[in-house]
Design a protein with these regions (language model features):
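Aromatic-anchored segments of alpha-helical transmembrane domains
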Residues: 33-43, 88-99, 147-158
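Membrane-interface helix caps and helix-loop-helix hairpins in membrane proteins
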Residues: 46-53, 75-79, 99-111
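Membrane-interfacial loop-to-transmembrane alpha-helix junctions, especially the N-terminal start
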Residues: 21-32, 79-85
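Structural signature of hydrophobic alpha-helical transmembrane segments
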Residues: 1-3, 49-62, 82-85
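Hydrophobic cores of alpha-helical transmembrane segments in multi-pass inner/ER membrane proteins
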Residues: 2-11, 63-74, 116-129, 187-205
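A contiguous pocket-lining binding segment that forms or flanks enzyme active sites
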Residues: 97-147
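N-terminal topogenic module of multi-pass integral membrane proteins
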Residues: 1-25
């Protein structure tokens, strides 16, 4: 999909070539846009009567990505930026390319879905490549273990509600990477292994293209965040 690439590239180019106070307002605006799409989907489900505890609780990984992306944009906490980056460039990108979406254009769910999915990818690109908050050493493993913890939370939600959060009880209806990983439950360990591989690939590509984290605060006694004009 070209639009996420164009928007991500534009935000990165602007942040690197013309840093300034506009970056703060861009972060706030993008956070509000992601929230509008994310929350708007739940509001729409309530209005049309499709909301249910089996399918509508915020237990999918994309829910975590949305929340983390918003928090990362507003606070620029390094751990949040790293999670937003790794999750957006793996899970969210895959969900954008192969959406498990029952509604097509011009449904409101089509717009809300792509608003917060594409928004998360743009946010990750802006923060990591535009603001140069590159992942620290070990970040990929932190993202992996936190992902497993979220999956465990989703599994508890599945047991309580009878739902299928994070597709732990059944594969998506529409084609995705899980479709080629065998039947339940074998696609679950395969999916975990693939997730780790993708995280390592993203981390490796980031470093190969010059994405090296700044010296840590513990090492030099100063904040590890890049000094930008809008950071107080």
């Amino acid at each position: 999909m070209p639009r996420p690439i164009v928007r991500s590239a534009a935000s990165v180019w602007g942040a690197r070539r013309h840093p300034g106070p506009w970056m703060r307002w861009f972060s706030v605006g993008l956070a509000l846009l992601i929230f509008a799409g994310w929350a708007g989907e739940y509001v729409a489900e309530v209005i049309v009567g499709t909301w249910s505890v089996q399918y509508s609780l915020p237990l999918q990984l994309t829910d975590a990505v949305s929340a983390v992306s918003i928090a990362a944009l507003l606070t620029r906490r390094q751990l949040l930026v790293e999670l937003a980056y790794f999750w957006s460039y793996t899970a969210t990108l895959q969900a954008t390319l192969t959406p498990d979406l029952g509604q097509n254009f011009p449904s409101v769910f089509y717009f809300t879905y792509f608003t917060y999915h594409v928004g998360a990818i743009v946010a990750a690109s802006f923060l990591v490549f535009g603001c140069r908050q590159y992942p620290r050493p070990g970040a990929v493993w932190r993202a992996f273990w936190i992902s497993l913890a979220w999956a465990a939370l989703a599994g508890i939600g599945d047991l309580i509600t009878g739902g299928n959060y994070m597709y732990l009880r059944a594969r998506p209806v529409h084609n995705s990477l899980l479709s080629v990983m065998g039947p339940w439950p074998w696609y679950i360990p395969s999916g975990i292994a693939l997730a780790l591989v993708l995280l390592l690939v993203v981390d490796g590509l980031t470093r190969a293209f010059g994405g090296v984290a700044a010296v840590t605060a513990e090492a030099d006694g100063r904040s590890a965040r890049p000094r930008l004009p809008w950071v107080m």
